[in-house]
Amino acid sequence: MFQPLSSKPSFPHRHLLGIAGLSAQDLTILLDLAEEAIEVSRQVEKKRTSLRGRTLINLFFEASTRTQSSFELAGKRLGADVMNMSVATSSVKKGETLLDTAMTLNAMRPDIIVVRHAQAGAVHLLAREVDCSVVNAGDGAHEHPTQALLDALTIRRNKGRIEGLIVAICGDILHSRVARSNILSLSALGARVRVIGPSTLLPTGIEQMGVEVFRDMREGLVGADIVMMLRLQRERMDGGFIPSLKEYFRFYGLDEEKLALARPDALVMHPGPMNRGVEIASRVADGPQSRIREQVEMGVAVRMAVLEALSQHLPNG
């Protein structure tokens, strides 16, 4: 599939647990591999053998459509045997702890486990207890590294660079693992990152991550090269974070009028799923500046790249 990693800098990590701890070079290695994976995915014959004979387990404790199916497709395109573990019908629903689940899965001798869990840090716990490689597919409000990678890839392919760009991340920053991972990755790659949202949806001390903070969306969008919208994660809210959805859209929903404040060639992105009419207007989501559908294609390529990179650390890999 790809050129042997020995001919270029190799990804030095056995797991992908987050963007935190990765260098700009680590990120670039994965993005470059993903560029090659895009070409593979666009061929008639998409099947490769990098993971032939290997077992990939998708262990999702939270519902997912895009991420789980993307990892499944990525694994199959690399030749892996892919098992999707349904938590709804598993021992977890019968009271089994995460540690017990980890020990059970480890006894099956998988090569890579992809995990999504509602608890921040759960993926790190599991990685300490298993012998295989572990990929974080989202842990609580902590991180979502492959989403950040596919967003960076989308930006780089459209703009030709990331360094020096102004990226405005707008919406529910407080509950968003996507926001955290994107802040870490884009900052490491040289972008200027802004976060925009009401005070109730901005984490305390977010400035310490090196971002510019705006509570006025119009002010925050001025001169932006990339506008990245986030959905309201109402399933993680237990109080009155916003007065109403109508008021939220009025002040923080991306419509054509607000988008006009960004650069004329600004790109619009969204990790999905979208709430049309809440954080983004349909005319913007489906408009010429939108790269939302392209992000989905980049997701498969990035996850192929991650699995390929980790395969170099598997026994006899």
UniProtKB/Swiss-Prot annotation:
Catalyzes the condensation of carbamoyl phosphate and aspartate to form carbamoyl aspartate and inorganic phosphate, the committed step in the de novo pyrimidine nucleotide biosynthesis pathway. InterPro entries: Asp/Orn_carbamoyltranf_P-bd, Asp/Orn_carbamoylTrfase, Asp/Orn_carbamoylTrfase_sf, Asp_carbamoyltransf, Asp_carbamoyltransf_Asp/Orn-bd. It holds the Pfam family OTCace_N. It catalyses: carbamoyl phosphate + L-aspartate = N-carbamoyl-L-aspartate + phosphate + H(+). Heterododecamer (2C3:3R2) of six catalytic PyrB chains organized as two trimers (C3), and six regulatory PyrI chains organized as three dimers (R2). L-aspartate binds at residues 94, 177, 231. One of its GO terms (cellular component) is cytosol. This is Aspartate carbamoyltransferase catalytic subunit. The lineage of its organism: Bacteria, Pseudomonadati, Pseudomonadota, Alphaproteobacteria, Hyphomicrobiales. Signal peptide: none annotated. Transmembrane segments: none annotated. Belongs to the aspartate/ornithine carbamoyltransferase superfamily. ATCase family. Pathway: Pyrimidine metabolism; UMP biosynthesis via de novo pathway; (S)-dihydroorotate from bicarbonate: step 2/3.
